């Protein structure tokens, strides 16, 4: 995650989309139940829960119990899902559907090795659902080639369910380009089927082909205007294009169709966050959490970020603490960010000792994380412990010797008006990654602050388009009632003009010398 306000982490577009696209549980891609089947399953669950409450025996087939467990897992009721699977395997030892469901439950709870162990015990390896499960495990291990071979061995590969299952598997695992060939298998036969069109739209969106995705989502909405998932898919495509107002509008239509459609609340929340309406973002994140469309640790992290942007440090800290409680002792991709933000909030409340304790606790869990050392250094800088800040940042650079790390440190120095230190960091970042998209603008701006006209010209000419100093001049004049800053900028622009004139005179002198030199040669 990047930073917009020092040094609070925020939802960059890329991070937001990655998280949003991968929050869906594996079950969502596997089950494409019709409304009739959904109704049957709802009745089955009601019977099961009534029998359980009254402690009455109820015999159910293995596939029925697997469906109940799947629904519970989809609702993130993991303990209840496990209870159903345990009960089912007592009644039906080794039942394939229940074993598959057990493996997926382990995947959903990030227990890859346990999922692999269960999958190895399944004997019916020829079954499509078993191949899908084992392919997902291979993809989780990074074995794309092996997964492709296994999926290619599926016999009924041109059936609609197989095409959808394989396509969504590739999409969910971050390989939308691998989904497209499978979808092309069904274009002629299924091109009017809503489920097929929805998969095509989702595939285009996952592959950043949002214009095509929007076209298909609109086609689906024409067919079925009260389908909340189509409106939400459209919203995600607009979000990809940073069209946040359109995202919110599409989400409103989704919620008009289904007021409990939590994913629409999630996309609204992300959009309000990027529109800097943090209060509304918090409301929508809470509704998304209520609708179980987002894991609670993610929800509280996002809510914490919103409160941090509002500079409500206490509520930000409290939500990061809640997120950590939900994670517990498990591994999580957001653990470092939560610790980092929690430490930042504590430092803003003047609780520096606690902030450093958080950093130390975090380093025990993720010792190679540059983010923690960057944050720790910033806290030391707030305490005016410059040497300790530098020590932390040296470790951060060793952990991540990249331009982005140096840019972050440069920004921290800038925040405390330590301009020479900032410039050294940014120039080293420029050396490491000359084509980094944000270094030249940062260096040009820093030279502007330092009134270094030669440096400014050097970096400004690398920008496309270059900074327009007259615009800067007018903007500064509007911001400075007493005119002091305007006078400073006017003087700086005059110096730049003089510098350009000097360069121009030097160029003319060089041209004259070049013209005279051949004549002298001829006279010889």
What residue spans do the PLM features occupy?
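Start-of-helix register in tetratricopeptide repeats
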Residues: 63, 97, 129, 161, ...
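Register position in tetratricopeptide repeats
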Residues: 74, 108, 140, 172, ...
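Single-residue signature of alpha-solenoid repeat helices
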Residues: 81, 115, 147, 179, ...
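Canonical positions in the second alpha-helix
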Residues: 88, 121-122, 153-154, 185-186, ...
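Structural marker of alpha-solenoid helical repeat scaffolds
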Residues: 91, 121-125, 154-157, 189, ...
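TPR/TPR-like (Sel1-like) alpha-helical repeat modules
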Residues: 124-128, 156-158, 324-325, 398, ...
């Amino acid at each position: 995650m990047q930073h917009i306000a020092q040094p609070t982490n925020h939802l960059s577009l890329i991070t937001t989309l990655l998280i949003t696209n991968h929050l869906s549980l594996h079950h969502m891609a596997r089950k494409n139940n019709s409304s009739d089947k959904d109704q049957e399953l709802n009745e089955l669950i009601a019977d099961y829960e009534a029998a359980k409450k009254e402690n009455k025996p109820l015999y159910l087939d293995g596939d029925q119990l697997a469906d109940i467990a799947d629904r519970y897992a989809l609702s993130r009721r993991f303990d209840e899902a496990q209870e159903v699977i345990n009960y089912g395997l007592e009644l039906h030892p080794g039942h394939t559907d229940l074993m598959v469901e057990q493996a997926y439950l382990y995947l959903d709870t990030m227990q890859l090795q346990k999922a692999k162990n269960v999958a190895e015990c399944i004997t019916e390896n020829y079954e499509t659902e078993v191949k899908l499960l084992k392919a997902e495990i291979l993809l989780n291990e990074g074995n794309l080639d092996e997964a492709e071979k296994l999926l290619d061995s599926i016999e009924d590969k041109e059936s609609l369910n197989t095409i959808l299952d394989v396509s969504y598997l590739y999409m969910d695992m971050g390989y939308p380009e691998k989904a497209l060939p499978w979808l092309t298998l069904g274009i002629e036969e299924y091109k009017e089927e809503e489920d097929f069109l929805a998969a095509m739209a989702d595939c285009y969106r996952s592959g950043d082909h949002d214009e095509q995705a929007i076209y298909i989502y609109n086609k689906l909405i024409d067919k079925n205007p009260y389908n909340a998932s189509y409106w939400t898919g459209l919203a995600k495509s607009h979000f990809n294009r940073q069209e946040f107002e359109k995202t919110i509008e599409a989400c409103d239509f989704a919620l008009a169709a289904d007021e409990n459609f939590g994913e629409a609340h999630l996309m609204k929340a992300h959009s309000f966050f990027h529109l800097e309406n943090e209060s509304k973002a918090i409301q929508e994140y809470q509704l998304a959490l209520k609708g179980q469309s987002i894991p609670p640790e993610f929800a509280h992290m996002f809510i914490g970020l919103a409160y941090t942007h509002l500079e409500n440090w206490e509520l930000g800290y409290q939500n990061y603490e809640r997120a950590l409680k939900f994670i517990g002792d498990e591994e999580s991709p957001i653990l470092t960010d939560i610790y980092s933000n929690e430490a930042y909030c504590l430092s803003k409340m003047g609780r520096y000792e606690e902030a450093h304790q958080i950093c130390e606790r975090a380093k025990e869990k993720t010792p190679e994380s540059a983010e923690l050392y960057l944050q720790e250094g910033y806290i030391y800088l707030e305490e005016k412990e410059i040497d300790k800040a530098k020590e932390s940042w040296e470790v951060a650079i060793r952990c991540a010797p990249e331009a982005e790390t140096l840019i972050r440190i440069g920004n921290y120095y800038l925040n405390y008006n330590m301009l020479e230190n900032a410039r050294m960091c940014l120039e080293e970042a420029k050396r490491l990654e000359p084509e980094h998209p944000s270094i030249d603008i940062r260096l040009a701006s820093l030279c502007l602050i330092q009134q270094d006209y030669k440096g400014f010209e050097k970096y400004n000419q690398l920008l496309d388009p270059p900074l327009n100093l007259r615009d800067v001049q007018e903007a500064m004049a509007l911001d400075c009632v007493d005119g002091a800053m305007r006078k400073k900028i006017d003087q700086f622009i005059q110096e730049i003009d003089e510098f350009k004139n000097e360069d121009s005179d030097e160029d003319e002198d060089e041209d004259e010398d070049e013209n005279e030199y051949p004549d002298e040669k001829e006279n010889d």
